[in-house]
């Protein structure tokens, strides 16, 4: 019998409340892959309420009220509270590698392979995830809220917009991965059907080994799609 037990409804409800109270920058500085994962970890008692630099001290106070916890200082291991920043691409140095586009959790960078990229300011969360992936170091951050920091530099409307954009980003990337997997699976099936005719390998033992490898890859692909 499976030992899996669904999450407690009260934990899920608390995670929902916490998630709505987070700024939704999806910056991962909390140590989790996204804001929802951090919210779930707090609700389950696996993370502290002081690991979100974008939310700052005001965010910690809100999370303390929601969880019944004591107000504590921001954990410096996760960063410091600061103003809202926007990513800016130096278009003269951009080589169009698309790595920043792939790294952006809210799809606010537009451009194409070997074409100039640019950031849509109104959609940028200042997550900084585009900075380390740029091979030519042509992305910088600009302070757009001066001395205002944390939630004083952010808003519930911006958080909601960012959550919606992140949800669509996840939907898009998962759909594209499925489509890519399906294309590869169709190609593998076609290769398998005409293996002897199209392969440069003529030795029967090597052909059978190649056939087994393709069949194993197809089996793994089917298993992944079924999960």
Spell out what each predicted region is.
Residues 2-29, 36-77:
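Signature of N-terminal electron-transfer/Fe-S-associated modules in redox systems
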Residues 3-8, 82, 123, 129-227:
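Flanking helices and flexible, charged tails adjoining ferredoxin-like Fe-S electron-transfer domains
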Residues 14-24, 46-54, 73-96, 101, ...:
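Ferredoxin-like iron-sulfur electron-transfer modules
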Residues 25-28, 62, 67, 98, ...:
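Residue-identity detector for threonine
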């Amino acid at each position: 019998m499976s030992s899996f037990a669904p999450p407690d409804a009260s934990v899920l409800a608390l995670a929902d409340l916490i998630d709505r109270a987070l700024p939704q920058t999806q910056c991962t500085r909390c140590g989790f892959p996204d804001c929802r994962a951090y919210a779930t970890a707090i609700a389950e008692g696996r993370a502290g309420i002081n690991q979100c630099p974008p939310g700052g001290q005001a965010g910690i106070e809100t999370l303390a009220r929601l969880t019944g916890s004591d107000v504590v200082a921001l954990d410096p291991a996760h960063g410091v509270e600061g103003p809202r920043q926007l990513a800016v691409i130096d278009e003269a140095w951009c080589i169009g590698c698309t790595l920043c586009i792939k790294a952006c959790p809210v799809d606010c960078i537009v451009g194409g392979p070997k074409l100039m990229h640019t950031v849509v300011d109104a959609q940028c969360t200042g997550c900084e995830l585009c900075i380390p992936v740029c091979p030519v170091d042509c992305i910088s951050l600009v302070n757009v809220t001066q001395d205002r920091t944390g939630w004083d530099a952010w808003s519930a409307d911006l958080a909601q917009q960012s959550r919606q954009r992140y949800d669509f980003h996840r939907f898009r990337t998962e759909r594209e991965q499925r489509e890519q997997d399906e294309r590869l699976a169709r190609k593998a099936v076609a290769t398998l059907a005409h293996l002897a005719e199209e392969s440069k390998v003529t030795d029967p033992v090597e052909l059978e080994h190649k056939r087994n490898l393709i069949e194993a890859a197809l089996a793994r692909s089917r298993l992944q799609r079924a999960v």
